[in-house]
Amino acid sequence: MAQRIILAFDKFKGSLSSAQVAEAFARGWRCVVPDSDISIVPIADGGDGLLGALSSHLGAKSHDVVAHDPLGNTITTHYATSGDTAIIEMAQVSGLALLNAEERNPLLTSSYGLGEVMRDALSRGAKSMILGIGGSATNDCGMGMLEALGYRFYDAEGEVLEASGDAMCRVARIDVANVDARLSECDIVVASDVDNVLYGERGAAWVYAPQKGATPAMVEALDEGMRRFAKVVGGEWHNVAGAGAAGGLGYALMALLGATLKSGIELVLDTVGFDAMLDDAELVVTGEGRIDRQTLMGKGPAGVLRRARSKGVPVIALGGTVEWCEELASSGFERIYEATPEGMALDEAMQQTTAQQNICHAAMRIAREWLLLHS
């Protein structure tokens, strides 16, 4: 029986945080094997949840800040600092989840709030930033963020533009005279698992804007706007993998702020020293709310699996739901389990208390099976 196990769960989206999933699993496991040494390692893949995952590992201090949401409404959001490193999650201030379905329009939304949070971090002495840019509501090529940091944008007539997806389509000149000088002394690492280029069929607008409320006509306008914006900026950053992340924010961060893009899950695992944790581990359990083909494409559990297998540590996966496919069958997971009982409605299964109970019961079943196989 495994005496030391690592629980490295991503969130069960819309239901439980990664820590809550792991705690529920640990309760169930200890019902069967009470003397197990269990380490909980919350993970995230660059989307929402990165702030919580890194903050818990680093003992980071949380800061509230007043900023603007994607439509310009004033909100109170938060980020964290560990030493002189700021950890910022775009979804907390410029996220799609902040808007209801009727409000989602990437011609109108702006990443300005993200820039405000970054500016606040600079004021607190940040010399480096880790940005999680998943879950965005925007498709403005980072114009809003840049505006909040001192960039100014003008149209062909010399009129000042207020950043938005629509304004991006009319940019003719960028003024950098008032850009926050502290940015030149700040290293920015972007956690993102999106490898799309800026524009074209694999670009931000065509692939992601429809999820943010864009009609086909909007998609065409936004894609053309990104081409225009990239022409004004110059260079070849638009062809770099990840430029299309967060509606072109990845492009702005690389091309204008000198940021480095890194796989979200790899960044988290490196930050927490996951490889060293594996040295005396006998089992790793990972998972997310829905396990399917996409799980293997840069998601958190896939990163955990890759690291653990390189050390010869077996990995079990647990999903709230599982959509079986050939890729999962040959992925290398020791076993893949589903927490939701057969016949239970998804809405019921996602209720927090029910989800915790389902995970706890699944953990008991997994522990018993593991005990039978390894006793």
Language-model segments: which ranges?
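N-terminal loops that bind phosphate or other acidic moieties
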Residues: A2-I133, A137-S375
